[in-house]
């Protein structure tokens, strides 16, 4: 069987279990002729066990015959950090105003979740990557 030619790669962030044909999903998939409801049903089925509303980055490969496949990534580090310290948004002045404190244990948990998407050599390197993200959000980092 010949390999199908990829026409487009669409990158979106979709809330777990809440994919529907409204923007931004509908227009992004519609312009490539993809079955929007097919994607929504498949995505919602795959994210059924996840926390509802958690943003999931998804990469959709659209083929020349208008079929598609998609790959889900891990939730953004910023979302996981905000969830760990129970805040709604990052600091407006990250280096001056701190919105909370995160411990090494919490950073390790986040690094384990993010591990498949990170290019870190080991857990310690992954923790440092997540710590950098936390600092850029205005979170005080302890133990790193």
UniProtKB/Swiss-Prot annotation:
GO cellular component: cytosolic large ribosomal subunit
Name of the molecule in the record: Large ribosomal subunit protein uL11
Signal sequence annotation: none
InterPro entries on file: Ribosomal_uL11, Ribosomal_uL11_bac-typ, Ribosomal_uL11_C, Ribosomal_uL11_C_sf, Ribosomal_uL11_CS, Ribosomal_uL11_N, Ribosomal_uL11_N_sf
Amino-acid biosynthesis keyword on record: no
Function as written in the Swiss-Prot or TrEMBL entry: Forms part of the ribosomal stalk which helps the ribosome interact with GTP-bound translation factors.
GO molecular function: large ribosomal subunit rRNA binding; structural constituent of ribosome
Family: Belongs to the universal ribosomal protein uL11 family.
Gene3D superfamilies given in the database record: Ribosomal protein L11, C-terminal domain (1.10.10.250), Ribosomal protein L11/L12, N-terminal domain (3.30.1550.10)
Gene Ontology biological process terms from the UniProt entry: translation
Highest taxon of source: Bacteria
Quaternary data: Part of the ribosomal stalk of the 50S ribosomal subunit. Interacts with L10 and the large rRNA to form the base of the stalk. L10 forms an elongated spine to which L12 dimers bind in a sequential fashion forming a multimeric L10(L12)X complex.
Keywords: Methylation, Ribonucleoprotein, Ribosomal protein, RNA-binding, rRNA-binding
PANTHER family for this protein: 60S RIBOSOMAL PROTEIN L12, LARGE RIBOSOMAL SUBUNIT PROTEIN UL11M
Modifications made to the protein after synthesis: One or more lysine residues are methylated.
Membrane recorded as keyword: no
Originating species: Francisella tularensis subsp. holarctica (strain LVS)
HAMAP family listed in its UniProt record: Ribosomal_uL11 (MF_00736)
Pfam families named in the record: Ribosomal_L11, Ribosomal_L11_N
């Amino acid at each position: 069987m010949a390999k199908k030619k990829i026409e487009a790669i669409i990158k979106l962030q979709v809330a777990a279990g809440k994919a529907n044909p409204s923007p931004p999903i509908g227009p992004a998939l519609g312009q490539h002729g993809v079955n929007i409801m097919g994607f929504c049903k498949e995505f919602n089925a795959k994210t059924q066990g996840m926390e509802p509303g958690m943003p999931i980055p998804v990469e959709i490969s659209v083929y020349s015959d208008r079929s598609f496949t998609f790959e889900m990534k891990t939730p953004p580090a910023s979302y996981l950090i905000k969830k760990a310290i129970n805040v709604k948004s990052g600091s407006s002045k990250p280096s001056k105003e701190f919105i909370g404190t995160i411990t090494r244990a919490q950073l390790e948990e986040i690094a384990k979740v993010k591990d498949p998407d990170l290019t870190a050599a080991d857990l310690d390197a992954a923790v440092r990557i997540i710590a950098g993200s936390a600092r850029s959000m205005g979170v005080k980092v302890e133990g790193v």
